[in-house]
Amino acid sequence: MTGKEFNAYCKSLKATTHVVQWGNAHVWKVGGKVFAIGSWDGGGWEDKEPAFTFKVTDIGFEVLPQQPGVRPAPYMASRGLKWVQHYESPGLSDNELKDYIKQSYDMIVAALSKKKQKELGLLP
């Protein structure tokens, strides 16, 4: 997945906002809470390939880093948060990456108050 594809996918999710911060990282939020971070072209990480960071379940945090190209997210995981980073090929396929980003988005939305979800148009 390219950085452009990452941004387009995150933008397609309802009520998201985008900001560039933390050394040119592309940070995607819903309700003011981060659900995905993308970095490329020297945007904060030294890796040559794009890096995509996202929240995962407890099981995902145990299983995903066993795959080549996926590791616990360097900053987030060191603070006890369940985030992983796809940082090099072969890693996850684009479809798998989109699925995990969507799951991250869904977890963040579920953690928002019902009032906030309604304000964002995420509840009927």
Language-model features: where?
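Charge-dense, helix-prone N-terminal extensions
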Residues: 1-124
